[in-house]
């Protein structure tokens, strides 16, 4: 009989275990007991050792007699996988103590020794073959040994349908994975009626339909937003988006400034007023505006010289306002086809004219302060204009002057 001795730690106690292995066969060989089976024996006896140590600690504190359990007369019997265990506790005649060191200062030796005898079970060849066949069948069918009652009862029809559906899903995912890893030509995919092609094509159709519906919904939302913000009719927006290529080319050839000029000439009253035949008063006003434009030109030259002298090439506020007014005047060509936009354009032009008139007044004042000669010329032009207006109709001063001249001539005679 081969014996092995080792210790098992349980709390603050070290339990000494005497393991005896009974030989098997005619040769009395104990090689059948491997190290793996030793670990199995320790796992099976771990709970028994823990309960015995706890019982001893309780008895020692309460000073009660120990129970006669797991003795030589009534040993513990357990069965493992292919072996039989017989174990009991035996009191030691000599008290042993652990060597005091830094690691196990509180470790004590358990006063009872645990004796374990292991023997191999005498199974026949037929019994081992039957057990192996049953275990392989259960492993193939996925049946667990812990739930034998579930394995014996047949599944319900609903459970069968669910299992079949899960198997089909697994099979399709595997087939898709193989198709992705091994791409094939389009002719083979069309010619074969495999499940992977049948499942992939409807998904692509659904995806394209979803994308088409999303694009249509987005276009409708854009049309509604344009209608609510700009108050444009929906039909005109749709016509703009559905124009023919020839129309778009003809629209692209014309510059936005030309569209603006043609639209404003046909609708703006200012250009109609300028196209009429000028009268005497209109000619005087035209001369006055030309004089103002000349003054503006001289003011711009002065500003340019001042910028060059100061080294600042940035725009003065007047130039910035003019560029802002020109930016307001220029509009895209597509927006000129709507009367509402043209009305807004006319309002913007009127506002720009007012700003230009204010700038001209400021420039004329600046010219008076800087160029007194030009100011005298403008004053003389205003005096001639006033005399011309006085000559248009007889006034009381002229009559008094004529009567005064007649009186003087009569006195001389």
From Swiss-Prot:
Keyword Phosphoprotein attributed: yes
Crosslink feature (Glycyl lysine isopeptide (Lys-Gly) (interchain with G-Cter in SUMO2)) location: 61, 79, 167, 176, 236, 288, 344, 353, 396
Ranges for region Disordered: 172-193, 228-300, 363-413
Keywords linked to the UniProt accession: Isopeptide bond, Phosphoprotein, Ubl conjugation
Residues found modified as Phosphothreonine: 389
InterPro entries recorded: SLX4IP
Residue stretches of biased makeup (Polar residues): 238-254, 364-389
Quaternary organization: Interacts with SLX4/BTBD12; subunit of different structure-specific endonucleases.
PANTHER family: PROTEIN SLX4IP
Family under the similarity heading: Belongs to the SLX4IP family.
Protein name: Protein SLX4IP
């Amino acid at each position: 009989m081969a014996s092995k001795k080792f210790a098992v730690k349980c709390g603050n106690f070290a339990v000494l275990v005497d393991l005896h292995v009974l030989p098997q066969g005619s040769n009395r060989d104990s090689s059948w007991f491997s190290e793996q089976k030793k670990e199995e024996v320790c796992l099976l006896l771990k709970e028994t050792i823990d309960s015995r140590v706890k019982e001893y600690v309780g008895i020692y504190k309460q000073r009660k007699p120990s129970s006669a359990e797991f003795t030589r007369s009534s040993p513990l019997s357990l069965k493992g996988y292919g072996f039989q265990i017989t174990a009991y506790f035996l009191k030691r005649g000599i008290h042993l103590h652990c060597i005091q060191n830094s690691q196990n200062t509180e470790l004590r030796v358990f006063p009872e020794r645990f004796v374990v005898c292991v023997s191999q079970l005498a199974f026949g060849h037929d019994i081992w073959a039957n057990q192996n066949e049953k275990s392989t069948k259960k492993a193939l069918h996925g049946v667990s040994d812990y739930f034998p009652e579930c394995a014996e009862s047949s599944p319900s029809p609903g459970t069968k349908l669910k299992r079949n559906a899960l198997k089909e899903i697994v099979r399709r995912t595997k087939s898709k994975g193989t198709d992705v890893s091994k791409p094939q030509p389009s002719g083979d995919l069309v010619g074969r009626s495999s499940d992977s092609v049948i499942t992939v094509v409807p998904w692509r159709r659904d995806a394209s339909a979803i994308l088409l519906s999303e694009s249509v919904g987005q276009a409708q939302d854009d049309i509604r937003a344009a209608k609510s913000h700009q108050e444009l009719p929906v039909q005109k927006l749709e016509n703009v988006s559905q124009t023919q290529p020839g129309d778009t080319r003809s629209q692209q050839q014309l510059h936005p400034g030309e569209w603006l000029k043609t639209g404003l000439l046909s609708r703006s009253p200012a250009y109609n007023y300028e196209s009429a035949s000028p009268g005497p008063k209109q000619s005087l006003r035209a001369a006055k505006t030309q004089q103002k434009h000349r003054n503006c030109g001289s003011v711009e030259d002065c500003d340019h010289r001042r910028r060059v002298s100061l080294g600042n090439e940035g725009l003065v506020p007047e130039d910035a306002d003019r560029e802002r007014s020109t930016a307001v005047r220029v509009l895209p060509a597509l927006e000129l086809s709507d009367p509402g936009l043209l009305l807004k354009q006319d309002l913007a032009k009127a506002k720009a004219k007012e700003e230009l008139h204010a700038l001209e007044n400021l420039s004329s004042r600046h010219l008076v302060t800087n160029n007194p000669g030009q100011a005298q010329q403008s004053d003389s032009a205003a005096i001639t204009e006033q005399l011309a207006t006085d000559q248009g109709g007889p006034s009381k001063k002229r009559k008094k002057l004529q009567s005064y001249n007649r009186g003087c001539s009569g006195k001389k005679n």
